[in-house]
From Swiss-Prot:
Protein name according to UniProt: Polyribonucleotide nucleotidyltransferase
Protein residues bound to Mg(2+): D493, D499
Catalytic reaction list: RNA(n+1) + phosphate = RNA(n) + a ribonucleoside 5'-diphosphate
Family annotation (Gene3D superfamilies): GHMP Kinase, N-terminal domain, K Homology domain, type 1, Nucleic acid-binding proteins
Gene: pnp
UniProt organism field: Lawsonia intracellularis (strain PHE/MN1-00)
Amino acid sequence: MSFRKPPIRLATQVGGKEIIFETGYMATQANGSLTVQCGGTIVLVTVCSQPLESDKGFFPLTVEYSEKMYAAGRIPGSFFRREIGRPSERETLISRLIDRPIRPMFPKGLAEDVQILANVISSDQENESDILAVTGASAAVMLSSLPFECAIAAGRIGRLNGQFVLNPTINEIELSDLNIVFAASSEAVVMVEGEANVVEEEIIIEALEWGHKEIQPIITLQNKIQELAGRNKIPFVPVEENIVFSKKVEELADKFGIVEAMQVKEKQFRKEARKAVKEKVLAILKEDPLYAEHSDILNTVSEIIGNLEKKIVRQRIVKENLRIDGRDTITVRPIAIEVGLLPRTHGSALFTRGETQSLCITTLGSSTDNQRVDSLAGDTVKNFMLHYNFPPFSVGEVKPVRVSRREIGHGALAEKALKYILPSQNTFPFTVRIVAETLESNGSSSMAAICGGCLSLMDAGVPISAPVAGVAMGLIKEDDQFIVLTDIIGDEDAFGDMDFKIAGTTKGITAVQMDIKITGLTTDVMRKAMEQAREARIHILSEMAKALDVPRSNLSQYAPQHAELVVNPDAIRMIIGPGGKNIKQITTVTGAAIDINDSGKISIFAPTSEAMEQAKQMILYYDQRPELGKNYKGKVRKILEIGAILEIMPNVEAFVHISQLAVEHIAQVTDVVQLGEDMIIKVIEITGDRVRASRKAVLLEEEGITWTPEESSRFSKGNRNGDRSRHNNRERTRRT
């Protein structure tokens, strides 16, 4: 019997699966908390907040998603046997997945430090936890006292045999040609993240329309649980604008040329012009006795000028169809491409679009270079990786150099875009790594990484199925009017209402990512954005084809050499050697990476062609097979009464009958043979794994006497009969 109030438990059916919300059971001291369950997967989501002591200039929302190994009945493999260190890449990506649709739902100006924690406490390794975490984050905030615009729910859309599937299992995702995670309110889609195996744009739109309808019961469930268990919302009063002061700032900014500053095409020059306007405005205001002593008012100058800049940019687009850099709404920035510019890399490309530049390098490695990922679903192996770097110099800034969440997210998106065009491991067994170094950035740097990454793959000679390009689309929405922008720059991203990244081939989509700053996006807007993006993508692909239209026919001379051998499975033991002695010697001497399959298939990666040939010979040494009529140098391993056993190859022994040890008759084997002695013998018979040899045949040939297999066979058979006669005589003697 519990002293607590009974928990509130609600459930609904979505996509043929039961989704369960339960609150008032765990983590009740949090501002808002609940568990979200599907099958045996349970995610505990909590939200806490505290008032801000001072305005930070941004909304301090922290989202952390974590997977605990106990959830899948496993113990962490770290030295301390606990989850320590920084979050995994998957945890980071899902944290971003939660943050992106949740953040816009908080009111602007909320003076609260908010932390959302999502912990996977049970995993059936069948139902994915990421969409439960996104939905749970929304529900937890709905239950809390924090103001929140509306409930959102997340879902995953797959496609099997041409049919959409909502929230497919982990195994079904592997078979699906579509894997789209989306979040939506009751009115519209607010976030999209996904990948596809070259799927047409209209199918993506249909999937989102279908998925939006399917997840409505989850939104209804959130509203219901809020009614039953939600806290009273804290009153939120937006900071009242000082209209008189704002008007004065705008007039001064206009006087000092803010309109002209926002028409400067070059990013850095525009930045300097805007800074100069702001400094002039502040200088005047600091001399005004009405404001000189009010630092709190002066601190709002940047925000006021920023809002004015946003208004100027948007109005120019709406009224004049002109953007900051002078383009219309559908034009892609000028493109410059260079491939093969780094002589010692396996593949390289420098992709420049406007003031955004990405240097992409492809490196090929062996199967031992793949990445092993430890997760709740078990250990998986990645043979393709794309790492995106965004150093501070790319935007002319000074900042600490470390891998940020943003870099991990952009790299994951670019990786999704390119993974479907790579050849299978059966035809191209290399591990492939792309590094995208952002050297300059003025928007769409992740899309530049996709374009440059594809070109570097082609320069490396990777036989991709089709080239891929990416482009970022923006949106300006004023009342009922909307304008889609092609290939947005950084300021258009900041001042616009949408960032919709789309990558694909000429035939279809391979990756999408959409974030918006408004309450939702209709499918009509998404359809327009995708159609416009397709035209831009085809243009970009045509520019890429001018630099390199097909993958190079050969790999770089500096790339690893690859070959496959098939050996007798019985020889594997000898190739490996006791304690791995032989295989270690081969890899040490040649520098090769060797993967041995139990079936006898051996995959070899060597740094040079010479090393490859050496590795082959060293492996084949242990897999030699005797040939009939061929001479071999053997070592005497065992002496028997009727002959000797010699090792003629690794793991291959031959029996030499006493009658075949010498030309003349000998009474005992030891008359001509000693243990450990080397001698040349000829293979005269092979029956299965049994090998018979003759020293006598070698001696006869040395004397110039022609030897034939029949002759040795006759001697062999005769002597075997003679042996049986002597054996039978001994038996008769014992009987008498």
